[in-house]
Amino acid sequence: MFEKIEELEVRYHELESLLADPAVLGNQPEFRRLSREHNDLTPLIESYRTYKKVLEEMEGNRELLADPEMKEMAQAELEELEQRQEELEGEIKLLLLPRDPNDDRNVILEIRAGTGGDESALFAGDLFRMYSRFAERNRWKVEVMSASESERGGFKEIVALIEGQGVFAKLKYESGTHRVQRVPETEAQGRIHTSACTVAVLPEAEDIEVDINPADLKIDVYRASGAGGQHVNKTESAVRITHIPTGIVVECQDERSQIKNRAKAMKVLKTKILDGLHQEQNARIAADRKQQVGSGDRSERIRTYNFPQGRMTDHRIGLTLYRLDSLMEGDIAEVVDALRTHYQMEALKAQAEAA
């Protein structure tokens, strides 16, 4: 393990020299690429340097054990340092895990109402609000790409672009079926109804990754409509694009300009095509190792929101929190962090078994 880190530390020094080179500074794409690599290595190198310092201090304390006057103090410090050594080793193992190349990407967030009719659409709106508030807390930008509103509020479907640092890393485990249990406002008997929404979190595709043949596209334009189906625009500004080879259909009517709607729809289409390729690749990997860790399977029921009990339960990790009000206001960092830790531990376990 440490031989590999020594090699990475040599590379880290190389990167520091390259980033100070005027030739690299003048080449912005190369500068950004090297900066990303440098930033990715920084936490590991800093932890390793701290680890080496702790080992040196431990050696010094062991030498002091021979001194009767210093023995007690040296022993106490040694015990603290041994604990710190263990913590750092765990930290370094996590940092050495293969990094998801999509972690730093923006995401396309899709929320679709499922079983439950109007109540499901209302819950889709609640989920979008929850993620929007979480984005605000992280200083991310949220841009609605397309939305199909329900007559009684909420959304039949909403698609949004979320831009910022580490968005996919934090949101990727939100993909799946979210179930809600609550009493609808129209329920006179006070009975609890169960409905569900599906959430998909897709890493935004870069133009260079997806090459689309214009001949493979069917583009329709139409007048944008509101929640009740009425036309809200006199011009045909809404755009529907069908990718014929895959059958993927995307729509955008959020902007008044057809050109802007088309650009947004193409961005979503490229992301969906790339996601399809990733899903195929993940399925092949899963077939090889018999299971898929943290795959974000959208058919999986991942979470239940029980409003009468004020409870949220994540079924994958058995986490239950009784503060539903604050969670729905975007205070979901505890859940996000718990999921990331869980899947990191699973990856470590799989790595140890494979070794």
UniProtKB/Swiss-Prot annotation:
The record's function comment reads:
Peptide chain release factor 1 directs the termination of translation in response to the peptide chain termination codons UAG and UAA.
Q: Which GO terms describe its molecular function?
A: translation release factor activity, codon specific
Enumerate the subcellular locations listed in this protein's record, separating them with semicolons. Cytoplasm
Q: Where does this chain mainly localize?
A: cytoplasm
Q: At what positions is N5-methylglutamine found?
A: 230
For this UniProt record, the keywords arranged alphabetically read as follows: Cytoplasm, Methylation, Protein biosynthesis
Question: Which Pfam families does the entry link to?
Answer: PCRF (PF03462), RF-1 (PF00472)
* GO cellular component assignments: cytoplasm
Entry keyword rRNA processing: no
Name of protein = Peptide chain release factor 1
Which top-level group of life is the source organism from?
Bacteria
Q: Which family is this sequence assigned to?
A: Belongs to the prokaryotic/mitochondrial release factor family.
The gene coding this protein: prfA
HAMAP family hit by this protein:
Rel_fac_1 (MF_00093)
Which PROSITE patterns does the record cross-reference, listed alphabetically? RF_PROK_I (PS00745)
User: Does the keyword field hold RNA-binding?
Assistant: no
- Mod. after translation: Methylated by PrmC. Methylation increases the termination efficiency of RF1.
Write down the Gene3D superfamilies for this protein, in alphabetical order: 3.30.160.20, 3.30.70.1660, 6.10.140.1950
